[in-house]
Amino acid sequence: MKISRLLPAAFVALTALAQSSDNSTKGSSVSYPVSLNGINLLSASAANISAALFAGNITSLELVDAYIARIEANDRQGLELRSIIEVAPTAREIAAQLDQERAAGNVRSSIHGLPIVVKDNYNTDVELGMNTTAGSYALLQSQAKGDAFVISKLRAAGALILGKANLDEFAGIRGSVTSAWSGRGGQCQSAYVVGGFAAGGDPGGSSGGSAVAVSAGFAAAALGTDTEGSIVNPASRAALFGLRPSTGITSRTGVVPISTSQDTTGVMAKSVWDIAALFEIMAVHDPEDAYSEAAEPFRRQNYTQFLDGNGFQNLRIGIPREPFWNETSQGYRSAITAGLEATLEKIRSLGATIVDPVVLPDAEKWKYSFVGGAERNSNGTIVIQYDVKEDMAHYLTTQRTNTSGLETLGDIITFNDAHPDLEFPPGYCCQATLVAADQLGPRNTSGEYWNAKWNQQQLNEEGIEYLFREYDLDVLLVPTEGGSSRLGAVGRSPIGTVPVGYDEINLPYGMAFVGRRYDEPTVIRAMSAYESHFPKRAVPPTLD
């Protein structure tokens, strides 16, 4: 990967404003900016950065130069975080344009000039100078037709797309490989664990690169996608706030798909304001997304209005002990249990009504997992395998140009088989899930598919919806580890994760508020209340 280099003159100007750090004992031996005019790039939220931009204390161009310098120091050298696949070669030019607009009094929105990174499965227009590949060399053979729908909305609001983040290749649907590894990006690793991935610093997936980039101070915020846990899990492991929106409330058009039944597009950032400010721009109707119309009555133009530091008052929170708080059945690290329980008690003391436990009917049905292979061992894996075959073909034929004959899932499989040196390096073989999906027939005439879809719907109605009705709940509260993200997948529901603590190797962990479908306002309220009363997230010790 070639990251665009800072121009020497720009770097000289930058160092006049920035404090630098020689992190040779922790990361890169290359000096890189730590702060700009009092804004610490490692800890500052998008809200902090936006305020500094509005105050005229920093410019978007200065931010871009600083972020690129930080990426160059520790992404492919230094700590080798491997969170970024490409940096936009046009970023400095666009930043200068946005600064000129601001100087002329033309500020598009609260995120005007804010540099963000987006997962490499979001289409970005070729004018930005970046590829969209889902981490795969196969998609490097073609170009995106234009911006994904949500990218177009964010750019119109003045957001600056700084780069494309690493991910599980094809967002984890390819087969059994480690989290946040892709052929193009390599193995992403946590900035929080000394020794990185080899020492247990698994960043989570599939949006691991997005999360690590924000935690390392490479961008103000990031976009991820979530089919089951792909925003919630990596955000948690990077000590970030993250929002997995209800499926359909944000558009998926122009995003490399896994499953139209479950996919969603969302945000990871360092504060809840950051989440709400980006989400409210993304949450608009898209006539090309089949799931968008159903969400229209529930959309709000302003989601920052739901930030409420006293939001726990009179909030009814359900605790589904089985199976999601059971460390034995769910396999999450026992070292985090005490922190989870202490957090729960503090939330109770802040005025929330804690209903503990709430009993999930047929809890055993929730103890499935996506094994990442050919097996269709649950309703979820059945639906996803049928979906990816047809959804990928639709994406390739409607959202790409110059496809070089790459029009079906089978074409991707064939490319990968023909290029094992690129796609199957030692330890990262193979593509069993894609192969199994490609062998399936049409989903519209498949009894297996529609039966699985019906079963998923019943699991939601008789499980998640039952809990909300039976116990008169506002949200559920669950650990982010241990499979709780399937509540969002099955319910197509919003999940908001908050940072809680750090385990014995300093890997962060979190908790998540789960709302009813389209009830993002209550989830944001709960996240905001949490943020107001709990300690600020710690920055990665490898970079501090």
What are these regions, as identified by a protein language model?
Residues 46-47, 133-137, 194-199, 206, ...:
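Flexible glycine/proline-enriched surface loops and loop-helix/loop-strand junctions
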Residues 54-55, 68-80, 96-103, 155-156, ...:
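Sec-exported extracytoplasmic/periplasmic mature domains
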Residues 56, 113, 119, 156, ...:
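Glycine-rich, small-residue loops and helix-cap segments
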Residues 64-65, 334-359, 391-399, 412, ...:
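Acyltransferase
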Residues 146-282, 493-512:
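Short glycine/serine-rich loop segments
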